[in-house]
Amino acid sequence: MYLNQLEERGIDSPKKLSSIVPNLHIPEYGSSMTSSIYLRGYGSRMENPVLGLYIDDVPVLNKNSYDLEMLDIRRVDLFRGPQGTVYGRNSMCGVLSMTTLSPSSYSGVRALLEYGSANSMMASVSAYGSSEDGLAVGGGISYRHTDGFFTNAYDGASCDPSDAVSMRLRLEKQIKPDLYFENILSAGYVNQGGWPYRQYLADTKELLATSYNDVCAYRRLNVTEAVKLRYDAPSYVLNSISSLQLLFDRMDLDQDFTDRSMFTLAQIQREGALTQEFVLRPKQEWKTEWWDWQSGAFAFYKYNRMSAPVHFKHDGISELILGNANSNIPEDVAGGYNDPLLIKEDNFVIGSEFGINTFGAAMYHESYFTFGKWLLTAGLRLDYEGNSMNYCSDAQIHYRFQPTMPDYKPFETVYKGRVGNHYVEFIPKLSALYDAGSIGGNGKARAFAVVSKGYRSGGFNTQIFSDILQNMMMNGLMADLGVYLDDPGTAVRAENTAYRPEKSWNYELGGNLEFGRERHGVSLSGSAFLIACRDQQITLFPPGKSTGRMMANVGRSRSIGVELSALYRLGDFALSGSYGYTDARFTRYDDGNSDYSGNRIPYSPEQTLNVRAGYTFTFMNPSFRALSINADCSGVGRIWWDEANTLVEPFRMLYGADATMRLKWVDVRFRADNLSGEDYNVFYFKSIGNMFFQRGKPFRWTVGLVYNL
């Protein structure tokens, strides 16, 4: 998709590509931090994504930065299927590649002003041009605000107000006839609320209003500095892409999402990353008519200093800690007290500090062999990745055992240590493409087959340390009293802090057809795939009234599906559509308590659908050049919300429309989404044994002015 198409459809973030790309689902929930991506049956709510994101050939290493402002994005490409041979880690189901406007190829001034529902507004301005000495300079800045679409019934305030600023500065220059230089600096700042979760009562199937009594907020500052060099030698082209990526963010959560004073989380990340890639491609005598190739080397280092204290309040202490502890004290030890164990503090903090190092290096090669109408590709990547985590979690309280202790006694729990892992992966790819060429002089056809391996990195569970320390605290308190528990009340153990990489094999067949000419033609494409996955990573909620969540390797799964896309043009009329179907199931998943083998993989939709039709009226009037009117619909579902497949979101459709008037100096755009006011769920989770949903955004509209000079 290109710039005009993105702006006409109101696609200002990657989340709005959902359903437009078959089998792609990026639900909009929580905040800008929650960039959960599902593609072809697989995905992740936490940590490492299944879809890699590249902006101007630079990989975005932290998923927290995926929800970005698409300021002056010239082109968007999504390569489906494992792309690990060239792109490496976390591209198990595909790669989303974005290219920004280049001042070497575009010169002018652009400005955009929008206003819409919920007092939403957006303003951006950018300028591009070249100087006489060959230096090309371009840059832009944007500001976005909304009052929010959801209300917190506890205090009547908006849950999800948001302010965001983005900027980019791009410099390009041909230093020598054979040396080209690019420098791209981008930054973004977000300050918002979010998490308008509603408690679900399974017995009555009632969805309560959003109501929580503590702050839910997210702030993020991310900066990326990229330097690209291209050396054009007589026999080869060597590209160097270097980047420095900084991320500073803070998430504050009322983690029980109720109006009770249970517990809150403040997660603060200070992350820095370096990447370096070299890509070598041949020219002239280094390649032949039948053989072409590319080779590359990639390395990265990332360090994340994270602080994630959990603040336990009165109700949380009473229910989660004292309630569990007192229920496990034998009656003959309790001395007739209903609550023999007391804690002096009305609130206390479980502190958690982490230092996480992630690093890796890779070498890869792809060869392309042309034999008549056949193009054969063979590639291999050797990928090494290591990680380590230093952690320290602690809490200090004063407790009293009423039958034997006249006063309170201090008690401290500390859990600290270091874990680390190293992985080596071989990532191969084989593909065959048959180009039938022209069909009767009025079209063309191609068919392809691909076998490739996918790989998603392992990592650490930082959000489970509060549960681990609660477990240790309860056992420690009981042991201090001479009571030893066979069952500490939770299944969480220290070994849950790390999880392994996820690996898959992808088998795919497909093709495309094109008929007609530019203003009257049809293009069709389709594919069928099978993915076999081992060591699948799934987000789990520990049993009971736990406060955290964790990623675990649960076993094996498989996903089969089809993807179809079509485009029909007749003069100024255009009709496009895409459809995806996925049947993704566990083939082996037994956690010791339940066997979920054969069940659907949660959160990933069974079907996606998008249809868009539009007509452009062209006028021979310089003051009113054209009018474009479009209507679209997008569907997604069914979605299974849990591993047991007891909760299912049905297939739903959302309808939208947009219109653009192209005047002499400006374009006037109008867009409306969710025209029917559909009420639907976009997310589900559990916290301390309670179930929660988030609803999708209601009907909304936007009107804007676009200026291009």
Where do the language-model regions lie?
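N-terminal periplasmic accessory domains that precede
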Residues: K15, S36-G41, Y54, L78, ...
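Extracytoplasmic beta-strand/coil segments of soluble accessory domains associated
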Residues: K15-V58
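Short acidic/polar hinge/loop motifs at secondary-structure boundaries
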Residues: D56-R80
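Transmembrane beta-barrel wall of Gram-negative outer-membrane proteins
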Residues: G108-R110, Y115-T146, F150, Y154-G193, ...
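Solvent-exposed loop segments that connect transmembrane elements
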Residues: T151-A157, W195-S211, D256-F263, H311-I350, ...
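Membrane-embedded beta-barrel scaffold of Gram-negative outer-membrane proteins
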Residues: K228-A233, V237-L253, F448-V450, M473-A552, ...
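Gram-negative outer-membrane beta-barrel transporters
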Residues: R281-P282, W286, Q294-G296, F300, ...
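C-terminal beta-signal and adjacent terminal beta-strands/loops
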Residues: Y455, C633-D642, A657-L709
